[in-house]
């Protein structure tokens, strides 16, 4: 908060130090500031379903509505750099301890215990760990931008396919990993 406090001095932006005493949560702030009939807009790709439902409840309480297909930053950040196209790379089982097939079997066991038909994976480290791959899409962590959906038979990986060489693609196919274009997760 120190840097933000310094950089916001003299602006009209008020720093809200979330988690500190007397500072409202985001939903409490919205609830107390939303006027009758107003709309709450957010990018539904980056808000959990629980948060989205909470915002919908708040909006309805104020006779308003939500708009979850809004990415205002995309509209104004015209020189935004493209997503990384750096290739993913394999990690040998001697470093990972288990094959992808073994990890998928372990996860499926946990899914059965939890009576889950589908497992949604959005954390990059979980995806990379499960698939024994790493990448260079972050300056600080060896991760690959991707999403995954897993069911009892398949593991659906949403990734820029250009990141995957033929060896990784063949290994994925053998392990039941189905590759989809990165942005298809939103379809």
Each language-model region and where it sits:
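A composition/biophysics-driven feature that prefers long, compositionally simple stretches
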Residues: 1-187
